[in-house]
Amino acid sequence: MAVSAYTVPTTSHLGFNQKKQLFFCNKSAYKRVSFSSRPCVITCLAGDSQTIVIGLAADSGCGKSTFMRRLTSVFGGAAEPPRGGNPDSNTLISDTTTVICLDDYHSLDRTGRKEKGVTALDPRANDFDLMYEQVKALKEGKAVEKPIYNHVTGLLDAPELIKPPKILVIEGLHPMFDSRVRDLLDFSIYLDISNEVKFAWKIQRDMAERGHSLESIKASIEARKPDFDAYIDPQKQYADAVIEVLPTQLIPGDNEGKVLRVRLIQKEGVQYFSPVYLFDEGSSITWIPCGRKLTCSYPGIKFFYGPDTYFGNEVTVLEMDGQFDRLDELIYVESHLSNLSTKFYGEVTQQMLKHQDFPGSNNGTGLFQTIVGLKIRDLFEQLIASKTAAPAAATKA
C-alpha cells in the first residue's frame, strides 16, 4: 500500500495524541505508524462515494440520543458503539449511519475547563479547526482518527478510527456554530426545549432519579444559561428544521412538563426537502381530531398548521398540543398529513409503535422526530440519485 506523508505545521489542531505527521493512502485499509513512539493520524480514501452530513444541535439532556435512535431505525438497524474499541466511545454506528458526538472535539478536559473557568458550551473549550477538518474529510470519503472525550473520567482519550459512512450525523452543542462546519451540512436540525420544559424535565430526572436538591438544580441551570444563550441558542436560526417543545396551552398554568405543545418548524426552499402539511398546503388550519376515531382523555389533542416567518425565513409550522392515549390510533392522524416521505401507508405509525417505549412517543416530540427521520431518508435518497445521475449525464454529453 503506497503511503505518502507531509509535515503538519506545529500549530495544527489535530487533537489529543495526534501529532506532527498526517498520512494518506489509496485503500480503505489502514495501519498505525509511529515515529519515536509518537502516535499519528492515518487517513485513507474510501472510494468515490460522498458522505451525506446531517447536523443535530441541542443543549444537554434535550433528547438528542432518542432522536438518533429514531433516525437510525428509519434507515434500518440499531446504532451501536464501535466493536472492539474504547468502551467509553461516544460514537454510534449502524449499517448506513455513523453518529459522532461533538463533545469529542473538546480541547480542554474537565479539569482544564475548571482551571480556566469555562464551560463545555464556551467555544474556547472546543477545537473547531479539527472539527471542520475531520467532518470535511469524512464528507470527501476519507477516514479519520477522531479524538474521544471520556464522559466518565472527564479526560481526553486516545483517538478512534472513523471510516466514512453513507450518512454522518454530527450531534452536540455546536454543529452550526462554526460557519465552515455549517457549510458542510446537507441538512440541519435544532431541538429547542423551552426553559420551562427544560426545568421541569431536569427536576423530574435529577430529583426523582438522582436525589439532587431543587436548589442545586436551579444553580446548575443558571450557571450554564449565559453560555447557552450566547453560543447554543443562536444556532437555531440556521437550522433547516426546528423541533420546538413548549408547555401545553390545553391546561392553564401547567408547569409539570408532562403534557407538551410541540412545533415542527420547517424552512421553505431547502433543496430536496418539502415541508409536511396538514389537509391543505399553505392554509392555516386548527384541527381537534378527538372523537369517534381517536381516543382522547383530558386535556385532549389539538393540531395547528400554517405558514409563518422564523428569523426572517419563510417557514411552515406543524404543531401538536396534547398526547395520544393509543398509539395505534395515530394512523388516523397520519392519514391527514401529506409530504411525509413514507415508503408505505402507515409507516409513521409503525415506527412510533416500534419504539413506543422511547421518551416522547405519546406526544409531538416522538411524532415529529419520526417524521424528520423519514424526511432525512428521502433527502438522502434524492442526493444519492442526483450524484449518480450527474456522471451519467456528463458521459452522454
UniProtKB/Swiss-Prot annotation:
Pathway: Carbohydrate biosynthesis; Calvin cycle. Residues 1-44 form a transit peptide. It is an enzyme of class 2 (transferase). CDD domains: PRK (cd02026). It comes from the Eukaryota. Keywords: ATP-binding, Calvin cycle, Chloroplast, Disulfide bond, Kinase, Nucleotide-binding, Photosynthesis, Plastid, Transferase, Transit peptide. It catalyses: D-ribulose 5-phosphate + ATP = D-ribulose 1,5-bisphosphate + ADP + H(+). One of its GO terms (biological process) is reductive pentose-phosphate cycle. Disulfide bonds join C62-C101. GO terms for cellular component: chloroplast. Its EC number is 2.7.1.19. This is Phosphoribulokinase, chloroplastic.
